[in-house]
Amino acid sequence: MEITTVSDEVIVLHDGCDVYRYEDLQPETQYTFHGLTVTTLARPDGELLSTFATVNDVHFGEVDCGVLGDNRRGPIQRSRPGDMPYPEIMNRGACAEILATHPAYVIVKGDLTHAGSDIEFDAFRDCYESHFADKLRVIRGNHDAYLGQHLYDEDLWIEMPGICVAVMDTAIPTETTGDIAAGQLAWLSERAASTDLPVLVMGHHQQWTPDPAGGTRRSEDYFGINPDSSDALNDVVAKHRNIIGYTAGHTHRHRVRSMACGVPTIEIGCV
């Protein structure tokens, strides 16, 4: 059993394929469900201007979810015999949750597929395009480019009331690791300078950050965005006070760290 979603009024827990959703809760209040204790978030002041949703690592085509190379320590998630494949179950559940929020946009941050096959891309489109149509915005991940493809590799700029979102391609075709090119960072800087609104940056790979205790190894084969490009992203963010954070997927976990400039760099768990 794990807690997968917490807002100011909703808590969602997953136990394999079983979902437990608790709604109409009070903000900043501690609750215990199924032996797990969690506190709802504070409700922001002011008027709600926009709602958008994001998912990543949806991995259509995967059978055993949670396997990393030859490491099968897991936890490994798979469907019950006779059920739809695990990604189909989880993504259709995610789409149902998202639809209930009436989002202006749904942003998918890469790893749409397991192996980058046409069948897997079609399965992704059948699920997400059928639910969200012109609200859908997509960027690729490493799994979507292992065969050298260039689908969904264009950086995107999304404007909504109260916020802008820059969605950036971090994939390197045929590679697991990530990068952001100098030209992309110049584009981000120009876009951020063009608006007074808050800007949230999104991509597939997580950012490298130095460990304050000095324990993070600086390596060109870092599993996320390489250290030099990660530093360059920090420099752009530091230059523009309206850039409020970077969010990624790739690691399949929830984690929040800080860039050197103090702005949050966030990893969002897989579907």
What are these regions (language model features)?
Residues 61-63, 114-117, 146-147, 208-211, ...:
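Short catalytic/ligand-binding loop motif for oxyanion handling, primarily in non-cytosolic enzymes
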